[in-house]
Amino acid sequence: IGRELAVSLGLAQDVVDTACLAHDLGHPPFGHNGERALNQWMADFGGFEGNAQTLRILTRLEPKRFDSAGRSVGLNLTRATLDASCKYPWSLQEASVGSAKFGYFIDDSPIFEWMRSGAPARRKCVEAQAMDLSDDIAYSVHDFEDAVVGEYIDPEILTSKSGHESLIRAVARWSNGTYSDDELAQAFDRIACADTWLTSWEGTRTDQARLKNFTSDMIGRFAGAAIRDTLAEAGGEPLAR
């Protein structure tokens, strides 16, 4: 997904691709529950955040290169690649009120400052934005796929009137008023009108193939919409640094 975005937007393909592969390296087992547990245990030492741990792995913990003083510089990646892998370019102390998301630990400040030299404070570079969007598209689509395969979601019920209405109400609550019921209903209808949409699931090989086709269709649709809107917003101006 990241490479498709990079190619279409004229970004450095290898930089975006590497960022997509690297950005979750610091996340622990058990997902965000594991991250919260580690954060509690490390509270007296500045806490724990998976994204900040990613930067530490790339620049210190993975021992591939060493400086003249014998200190590890990690994988010795380029400034652009490290910056593209940084989802939250700020420390815990600089994070927004109520947010526990940050991109580097205080004792990693020197490498962060080198990485972000000349960049606007708290603004992700365009390659990091492409990585972030790729991540959103990938996990959103594949979470749906996993839910269908695990039989947590029944496409037949989802498409029924009662299931449809329940879905709209649930998403409306989750979005906290960001989208109206009408907007959500229209969005669902657009997806359900896709030729690849599943109306039932019995777990057959044919169903599995149909589900794979649907997820591929959704990835292409979401990536394509982002590409079109981004190019239109840029007005022909180059996006690459």
What are these regions (language model features)?
Residues 18-22:
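Short glycine-rich or small-residue beta-strand-to-loop segments that form or flank ligand, phosphate
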Residues 224-241:
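Substrate-recognition/cap regions that form aromatic- and gly/pro-loop-enriched pockets
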